[in-house]
Amino acid sequence: VRMGQGCVVVAQSGVAGSTELSDFVVLAAQSGVSGHLKIAPGTQLAARSGIMRDTEPGAKLAGNPAIPAKEYFRQMAVLGKLAKDRHRKN
């Protein structure tokens, strides 16, 4: 594993072998990165998320497998609405 300058790796995060973390990468708590990847500069990974592919510079990712954070949170909002609608009487 290689780490660039200014990286932040929070508790219980894992990085598999031969992975390269570029400068200013942030891995939040309980996140993971699979092996043989190049994590681009400025990438941010949300807690409890996992990266399976190389990233683009400045990417903000969430989920497992990781997707753009904005898309991930939209999906979670839709799932919440579906759950509420399921219990609503017609």
Tell me the role of every PLM-derived stretch.
Residues 1-68:
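Structural signal for interior beta-strand "rungs" in well-ordered beta-sheet cores
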